[in-house]
Curated annotation (Swiss-Prot):
Its main location: membrane. Residues 348-369 are annotated as: Disordered. GO terms for biological process: sporulation resulting in formation of a cellular spore. One of its GO terms (cellular component) is endoplasmic reticulum. It comes from Saccharomyces cerevisiae (strain YJM789) (Baker's yeast). It comes from the Eukaryota. Involved in spore and ascus formation. Required for the efficient assembly of the precursors of the prospore membrane to a continuous prospore membrane. It is found in: Prospore membrane; Endoplasmic reticulum. The lineage of its organism: Eukaryota, Fungi, Dikarya, Ascomycota, Saccharomycotina. This is Spore membrane assembly protein 2.
Amino acid sequence: MLFPKRLIVWGVLLILSLSQFVLYLPATTCTNSKGLRLCAPQFTITVIGGSSTANEFIASVREFLRLISYLTIDMGWSNEFTDPSVYEDENLVDTFQPDKVFELNYFGFCKRSNKSKVYCTSNENYGMDVLEVLVRDVGIQLGNISTTRSNETKKFGDSLVLTYRLALTSIRDFLKHDKHTGNALSKALIGSPDPNVKGASPTKNYLKGVNLAFILMMFNGMVFYFAVLEIIVGFLSICVVSAFGGALSVGKRHRLFPILLKSSSSILVVIATLTILCNIVYLIALKTLEPEEVTDVGSDNAAVHTTGWELLKVNVGSGFIMGLARYAIQWVLLVLAFLAANHYKAKPKKSDKYTEDTSNSPSPDLMEK
């Protein structure tokens, strides 16, 4: 009768460990355009604009991308670009158009337009940094415009992301050092603030935007490695549960395997908690880039912008919901793992207790003295 009970306990632990690991599969989607384009994103974002600074920035970027698209077509490597229709707006870089939706995941992202996926690609080890996703999309589209060789589009995206990271670091250092010189160079490049206009100066707004982009870049790199580590520990948890079941089939009481079971389950929950918290923090950070809706259009009270860079519409994806379900299963697995480990751990033998008691009791010689 004891063996079937042990088998049932091990079966429940194994089902839970396999279930939580299977729920990691959505986290690895959004990386491949070939075949069936599966994507269960953590977040979906759309560039829509909001504050005056963000609208000016988006308009400038759109015009710049239009110019770059024209230059890329004119300097293209293919003779196929002879039709004047290639200069129409729908054939140019459309990253910052409001009808384009980007589905972000840990290892890649998908671009969607009118509910149909345009493409999916891996995002290397940069995680879900929304700005790097936009930059990579620009590079991929430039690659599609400039050459017919499909393997070049990935290189365009990689090189443009690397350029963005280097430029962001340089601009951040430039604006920080320029503060000590009275923002002389910044005023020459951006312009002096209008004394009649209330609010932060353009220099401060751009520095705030650059600092926010830099923080997002570093933060998402950390979240990416948390996600990788969590998947590895989740797989090791299956191995430990399987070994624990093999040990239970041999005997009821064990010393090592209960300790391994409790340790692996605890480490998994700790890392999963860090990942969930990071995702929640990132969601809150993205929400600060979302313009507030003005309920009364005719009201004199305008929406209060928290950063001056409100330009995104952010939604939670199906992958985020599955991550919460996986996290709940991991907590159930942790509780059952501790109960099973404490129940089937080896108890001290009577001989061990006798040895301990005799070692702690005083000797007869000492009693006589």
